[in-house]
Curated annotation (Swiss-Prot):
InterPro entries in the record: P-loop_NTPase (IPR027417), RapZ-like (IPR005337), RapZ-like_N (IPR053930), RapZ_C (IPR053931)
Binding site for ATP: G8, R9, S10, G11, S12, G13, K14, S15
GO molecular function term, any single one: ATP binding
Designated name of the protein: Nucleotide-binding protein Sputw3181_3461
Family, as annotated: Belongs to the RapZ-like family.
Record key words, sorted: ATP-binding, GTP-binding, Nucleotide-binding
Reported function: Displays ATPase and GTPase activities.
Binding site for GTP: D56, V57, R58, N59
Amino acid sequence: MKLVIVSGRSGSGKSVALRVLEDLGYYCVDNLPLPLIGSLLEQLKGSNDLVAISVDVRNMPEQDKVLVQQLSNLPAGTEITSFFLNSSDKVLLKRYSETRRLHPLSKSRVSLQEAIKLEGKLLEPMSKLVDHYIDTSNLNIYDLSDQVRQILLGSVDKELVIYFESFGFKNGMPTEADFMFDVRFLPNPHWELALRPLTGLDEPVAEFLNRQPLVNKFIWQIENLLETWLPHLERNNRSYLTIAIGCTGGQHRSVYVAEQLAKRFSNGKHKVNVRHRELDHAKA
């Protein structure tokens, strides 16, 4: 089992790091007291081999010896990777001033500046024990995400799941689409009597549309558009991308185009899913 422990001063980016880990398939728990880690791992044993927790200053032992002892009591075979995120006092003060959030130690009737300094002192033992110390003072959320992925995977790239969805405009547009393309201008198999009862999944319809230069040109241009911008979308902390293709009824053209695009992007670089809204509704 792999366990990632994320600690650090509040406002330094622990939540960002935890979101990255969640996207990588980790079971994430925020602000878990260290004595409960062993119980958590026992409960997840056999069901999830990737676990990540963030540790709050309020859950940290005062002495580093206690911390080491608690970690040594974890189940045998646990592979631990630890991060400590930190920023300068000036940057943390600025971030808290901008978000107007309450610092975890502010309830002790101390000023924000005093709370930030106190937290740094309390977390100092932890900062000396971790595997990876990251100063986020000059990092934005994308830079930090890249660093976490680079450490865990050896690469900043993340697997983007692409959904191609066909639909019919007469039944409304899908609300979850990131990109939407209207193919109602393409030649319509509906007007071919032999093709009317078929769908874009059937070979006769596919052959008809494949013979249309306009159809092939459109698919080629959409493919180029997506190939150009996918790397930038992947770097933007996206986990998935939904591309909707719509025709009038969602039976012929949109189905065929969605299938063709899905085939072209099923090249091992991306995880691709294709769904046909109107055809799925007809089966239900």
